[in-house]
Amino acid sequence: MKYITRTVWVLSLVSLFTDAASEMLYPIMPIYLKSIGFSIVLIGILEGVAEATAGFSKGYFGKLSDNAGKRIPFVQIGYAFSAISKPMMAIFIYPIWIFFARIIDRFGKGIRTGARDALLSDEATSETKGKVFGFHRSMDTLGALIGPSLALIYLYFYP
């Protein structure tokens, strides 16, 4: 696996852990939000605005990282936003604060995605691009499998 450089490993592992943390929350999030007073409509609005935030910010911050010529700060800030937002969602009880935390999480995704993908591309040759991106995606998907599994185990023992 010579095409998997240290940078690719680091980005892939960070992606795995971030996705595991996110996917632990998502299955129980609607139940939690409903228990603190969110209506079904408000949950839908929250998720729609959060995903729109990620979608619209990806292009902007991707171009900004290209223009700045620096990718690592965008990746670090993006993952930091996502990491900070997870405990915020658990400790906040007011809908506006939960809304804020969820937007920060998706904003972090928008900040990091373009720069992270550019870093992965920079680490690959034309022959290894598919392998590098495939490896990263598989680690991300593994995180998406681990997260709900850990949540299920936790909820089984601590309902």
Regions found by a protein language model. Give the residues of each.
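Helix-loop junctions at membrane interfaces in 12-TM secondary transporters
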Residues: 88-102
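Structural signature of the two symmetry-related core transmembrane helices
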Residues: 73-87
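Cytoplasmic helix-loop-helix junction between adjacent transmembrane helices
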Residues: 101-142
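Transmembrane alpha-helix termini and helix-breaking/packing motifs in multi-pass membrane transporters
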Residues: 31, 35, 146-159
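Residue-level signature of mid-helix packing/kink "hotspots" within the transmembrane helices
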Residues: 51-59, 144-145
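Helix-to-loop junctions at the C-terminal end of transmembrane segments
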Residues: 57-69, 155
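Helix-loop boundary and gating motifs at the non-cytosolic
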Residues: 1-54
